[in-house]
Every structure is written in structure tokens, then in C-alpha cells.
Amino acid sequence: MIDYSAILNRYRPDEQELQKLKSISEYLTTRASEICRHKNIRADPVLVGSYAKGTNLKDGDLDLFIAFDRDYEEKIMEKLGLSIGHDLLPNGKEKYAEHPYVSGEIDGIKIDVVPCFKMEFGQKKISAVDRTLLHTRYVNEKLDGASKDQVRLLKVFMKSVGVYGAEARTYGFSGYLCELLIIRYGNFENVLRLFSTTRGRLKIDDDERFEDPMVLIDPVDPDRNVASAVSLESLSRMRIASKMFLDNPSESFFDLERKPIKPKYHDRGTCIRIYSIEKPDLTDDVLYPQIYKFKLALLRLMEEYNMEPVGSAIDVADRIYVLIETRKFISDSIRIHVGPPADTSNSIDFIKKWLTRERSRGPYLVGNRLYVDTVEERKTPEEIVLSNISKYSIGKNLDKLKNTIKVQKFEEIKGRIRVLDRFFSEEAFGGLNSLSA
């Protein structure tokens, strides 16, 4: 029998933290209102996010939106909103995701001040974040205190198994999605039953406009899929973890302080290379898509040279680290160029092109498709990358840092590296594998 009350006591904010959050939030809203009056700005401060909805976990942050009248031009709204943010957070920094905002701290509490437009139910959003105001109102109307604790349990569970967070770092479940799941299914265990008993795409709302792995329509915006950020891997991980928990319930599924197991590195008979690049100072939502482009470019290069990639991992620390594992340590001496089918209009062009080029065989047919073989200089994975990465775009910011790429060979590494820990880790589901036995 799981003692859910003990779990909640462990991760729910205590009275001291709640009082601190209340004091800071009251200061922010009062001060923001004063600034708006003093500068004749037609806007109101509105607390949003998990604290405003009462679904926050301990050590949380505060989100203050500055909601402007809808007749402001968007650029003016952003400029004035950022100005208010800097007044409230003198040491804050401007950040950009879908929308510019100011991020800073007061007394150890992280605070985001975000400009937006006022929005009522049924109105169209003007800026990307306007609907957040309605999310807060909707959740507070639909959830009572006990249900909000069910949201907290779901959040802790998802954090523990590595699927919480809609940001590009995780491609998982947002806090708002957790709240909607509890609103829809009543409690934490019912939500887990949903994940454990469904197969294929999880279409909670069957809307043919969306082809995402999971679909749940936003009740305040019928044109938005709240679950659009959930990747197939995150959905699959949640399904496995839900089955494991329901089969063998354990409080270990709610342990956010669990220390990661240091896996044993071992020779798999494969070629493992770690490519690192300087890390630009960017928000996760801007940085991580570029990291994934970097990894994809490395994998495509390995495929292009028939190196047979079989594994990969990423980690972000002082630099960005991408591990690529291939079956081969060196490329083939023969490279096969795949041409068009014989019955296509460009088949003759392919033949003519290669008849004037150096080759070891061909053009020749296999079935109805043309091929040409060329003799290639044999290269190691790192030689392939360093001589060819320039032809791939890996993102606006990382493209400028390609000259900082460094390579480490697995067989030469002494000590521990976190990206290797991730690669060799047995913690596929937050270290819970043993609980399924």
C-alpha cells in the first residue's frame, strides 16, 4: 500500500516556503501595478503557473505575466513589458523562447516576468503566451485541493521517470498537461491506467488535424494540442513506467533524490567517439533543437559513409557532448552510389554523368535501379566528421562554433564522463528497472 500522504508531505511546499512565495508574489504584483500607473501603461500583473494554480512542488518558481490591453502593438507591448520586468528584477536577464521575457531571482526564488495580451475565453490569442492566463483560470475552476494534490503526485512520478517538462530538453509532459489529465481522469492512478492500457497513438481527443503521438485538445483553445511536445519516446517511457508501477507499486517511483548509478564502462566491440562543441549561452528551448541537429548531422555522416551507426547519447555541461557509436572503425574502400530506377526520366543523365567520372565499377543495374561504385580513401569516424561537418547546418548558433569541435576516443578515456554514464546507464526508466522483477 502506497502512503501517498507521505509522498505529498515530502514534495509539497511547506508553510514556510508558501509564505515566502506569497510575500514575494504580493510584492511583485503591487510593485508592477504601481509601475503601470506611474507610466500610464494599460496593463495588469497576473500571477500564473503552478504556484497560482496550487499545483506547485517544493523549490518552485514564480511566473508573473504583465497583461496588456489588446490595442497595443505587439512590439510596443514587448518593449514595455520588458521594461517593467527590469524594474521588478534589476539583476534580471532578458531571455527569448516563443516570446521575450525577463528572468531573475528574489531571495533565492526564480522569477519570470512575461509580457502578454489580455485574453478572454473565445478570443483569439495575439501573442504566443496569451492563453496562459486562461489556463490558470480554467485549472482553478476545475480542481479542488485534493485534486491538486493528485496533480502533484503525477508530476513527481513523471519527474522520477524522466518525462516531465515540455521543453526541448525533455519533449515530455507539461505541468498544464498533467493538470488536464487529472481533470479528465480524476486521480493519479486512473491516469496511469490510461497509459498502461492504451496502444499506438494516444488520442484522448480524436482530432484529425493533429498527427502527434499524443493528442489532447486545449479546453481554452480548440486549435491547440496541449500534448504536441510529447515525443513518441516520452509517451512510450510513460507507458512502460505506468505498467511497472501498477504491477508492483513502490514509493521508489517517487524518489527525486535517488542518486544515479554509475554504470560500468565496457568494450562492446564497437567504435565510440565523443564529439564536443562549445556551448553558447542560450535558453534550453533555443539550444536543444540545435544539439539534436548536431547529433542528426553526425549520424547522417556515419550513414553516408556506411559506418553503421548503432547508438548515441547527448549531455550538456561545460560543453555540448554528443556520443556516436558505430559498428565500423574505418570506412569502406568502396563506396556505392545509388542512382535512379531505369524507368525514370533522369536515368540516362545519371549514366552520362558517371561515364565522365572516375569510378571502379558501373554504372550497373541491380533489379531496375542504377548503381556506381567508386574507390574511396578509408577514413575514421572523426576524420569523416571533421572534413565534412561544414556541409551540414547544425543551427544558427552552433554553425558559428564548428571550429571548436573536439573528439575523444572511448578507448583513450580515463575516468568518468557524464555522456558515457548516460550511454551505458541501466536507468532506462529512472532506475526503476529492478522494480519490475
Swiss-Prot record:
Whether Membrane counts among this entry's keywords is no
Q: Does the keyword RNA-binding apply?
A: yes
Matching entries from Gene3D superfamilies are given as:
Archaeal tRNA CCA-adding enzyme catalytic domain, Beta Polymerase, domain 2, CCA tRNA nucleotidyltransferase, domain 2, Poly(A) polymerase predicted RNA binding domain
Write one Gene Ontology MF term: ATP binding
User: Which residues does UniProt call coiled coil?
Assistant: none
What does it do? Catalyzes the addition and repair of the essential 3'-terminal CCA sequence in tRNAs without using a nucleic acid template. Adds these three nucleotides in the order of C, C, and A to the tRNA nucleotide-73, using CTP and ATP as substrates and producing inorganic pyrophosphate. tRNA 3'-terminal CCA addition is required both for tRNA processing and repair. Also involved in tRNA surveillance by mediating tandem CCA addition to generate a CCACCA at the 3' terminus of unstable tRNAs. While stable tRNAs receive only 3'-terminal CCA, unstable tRNAs are marked with CCACCA and rapidly degraded.
Question: What assembly does the database describe for this protein?
Answer: Homodimer.
Binding locations of ATP: S50, K53, H135, K155, Y164
Q: Enumerate the UniProt keywords alphabetically.
A: ATP-binding, Magnesium, Metal-binding, Nucleotide-binding, Nucleotidyltransferase, RNA repair, RNA-binding, Transferase, tRNA processing
> Which residues bind CTP per the record?
S50, K53, H135, K155, Y164
Give binding positions for Mg(2+): D61, D63, D112
Q: Name one Pfam family in it.
A: NTP_transf_2
Co-factor requirement: Mg(2+)
Q: What is its EC number?
A: 2.7.7.72
Which reaction is this enzyme known to catalyze? a tRNA precursor + 2 CTP + ATP = a tRNA with a 3' CCA end + 3 diphosphate; a tRNA with a 3' CCA end + 2 CTP + ATP = a tRNA with a 3' CCACCA end + 3 diphosphate
| Record-given protein name | CCA-adding enzyme
